[in-house]
């Protein structure tokens, strides 16, 4: 009974397998074209990443400047209080 379950198929089908070589293997001009496309894609991708990083850095600098402005205002307020106290004690 088990010999019928584990039996090999009578023939092997090759219809689902593609037997083709890459065009870049046979034609060197196509290899250069694909590398040019790849380098163009890589340069566009790098430009997008650089732009994102630049925008992120600008946003961080804007936040830091705003924080610095608030700290300076607070420091000015504290200095004015200290000056008033010093004048009142004299």
UniProtKB/Swiss-Prot annotation:
* An annotated GO cellular component: nucleus
Q: Which residue windows are coiled coil? A: 42-89
Keywords assigned by UniProt, alphabetized: Coiled coil, Mitochondrion, Transit peptide
Write out the GO MF terms: ATPase inhibitor activity
Highest taxon of the lineage:
Eukaryota
Q: What compartments host this protein?
A: Mitochondrion
Pfam families listed in its UniProt record: IATP
Transmembrane stretches, start-end: none
Q: Which GO terms describe its biological process?
A: regulation of mitochondrial ATP synthesis coupled proton transport
- What task does this protein carry out? Forms a one-to-one complex with ATPase to inhibit the enzyme activity completely.
By sequence similarity, the record places it as follows: Belongs to the ATPase inhibitor family.
Give the protein's recorded name: Putative ATPase inhibitor, mitochondrial
The organism of origin for this protein: Schizosaccharomyces pombe (strain 972 / ATCC 24843)
Question: Gene of origin?
Answer: inh1
């Amino acid at each position: 009974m088990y010999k019928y379950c584990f039996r090999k198929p009578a023939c092997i089908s090759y219809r689902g397998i593609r037997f083709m070589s890459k065009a870049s293997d046979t034609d060197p001009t196509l290899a250069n074209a694909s590398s040019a496309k790849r380098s163009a894609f890589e340069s566009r991708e790098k430009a997008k990443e650089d732009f994102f990083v630049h925008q992120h850095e600008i946003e961080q600098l804007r936040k830091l400047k705003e924080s610095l402005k608030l700290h300076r205002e607070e420091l000015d307020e504290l200095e004015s209080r200290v000056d008033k106290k010093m004048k009142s004690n004299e």
